Amino acid sequence: MKEKVVLAYSGGLDTSVILKWLCEKGFEVIAYVANVGQKDDFEAIKEKALKTGASKVYIEDLRREFVTDYIFTALLGNALYEGRYLLGTAIARPLIAKRQVEIAEKEGAQYVAHGATGKGNDQVRFELTYAALNPNLKVISPWKDPEFLSRFKGRTDLINYAREKGIPVKVSKKRPYSEDENLMHISHEAGKLEDPMYIPDEDVFTWTVSPKEAPDEETLLEIHFEKGVPVKVVNLKDGTEKTDPLELFEYLNEIGAKNGVGRLDMVENRFIGIKSRGVYETPGATILWIAHRDLEGITMDKEVMHLRDMLAPKFSELIYNGFWFSPEMEFLLAAFKKSQENVTGKVIVSVYKGNVMPVARYSPCSLYNPELSSMDVEGGFDATDSKGFINIHALRLKVYRLTKKGYEK
């Protein structure tokens, strides 16, 4: 009996060649295709996998789970890698790998496989998830396999092999970028973008219009949260209302994209140490991130917020590096869930030509006291108390300065 392997399959050149290569090595290959919002013809992918040699093909719609259990979860901790990247690719990988493991267990497969390269982050994200969820599964990673690497040294070898084996190869002109698309974002890398001084042409962007070409009128959105989780969005101009999590997120993508929101061009640090330039389009998540952060301003205790903000970079790093299913992540998520207990209310944001600006907010759990904050009303605050407050904090500074002068003499 052949040993079984569950392959994370996209229908592209790399994973199609890997599928056939695994079949030739004597494996029974089960192809797994995850729909996380990419614009693909899934029936065509299924047909291609079967013709290439897969014994079975799983195609699953994971979009709703992706939104509720991954995108919204990352929002609780204000995940933002290196202060800029909203982690669209990184957040999707643990979900895909988790289902791959579950299918392997269901099918009695001994192996899981993926087509991620040996230079990127995805190989780590997939394999750490496999290890965390089922340490007994064996991993086949062809782009780190000496036998595979000796046979396929580049794209030309892959194309020649595919044609030799009757695997359909698209002859249409391919976009000169490496792209990853899901419900949260689309990323563009490689090609001309590898030159950090190259200014991307407008044709790089496929989701968002240029802010310069966006409508001349703002869109006002009222976004509601319960304990940090988005529950409703209302367009205050036309009355459109969305409460279903998936529909809500898709609608924010639509509004953000047509208003030029969510573009990012940055050089980031990959986990393995290589610097990489990425151009991202993340419209809906950008709107949510800004609105959520604004609501926290009136609902979170100062010290809780500052402590959470200290943990947020580590949280983002764990997601980026593939540690979604780790004990440290469990700890952080428990802390973030606690921090969001009062983050309930609504924020009105103005979406206009690439910008998202909060303009109003309300919460039944608000810690904002107009009388305390007023420049004109005391509101129970005795201003003379500030003198002692300042003196206490100044003591350390005075001692430091006087001591330093003594040393210098």
From Swiss-Prot:
GO terms for molecular function: argininosuccinate synthase activity; ATP binding. It catalyses: L-citrulline + L-aspartate + ATP = 2-(N(omega)-L-arginino)succinate + AMP + diphosphate + H(+). One of its GO terms (biological process) is urea cycle. Its EC number is 6.3.4.5. L-aspartate binds at residues 117, 121-122. GO terms for cellular component: cytoplasm. This is Argininosuccinate synthase. It comes from Thermotoga neapolitana (strain ATCC 49049 / DSM 4359 / NBRC 107923 / NS-E). The gene is argG.
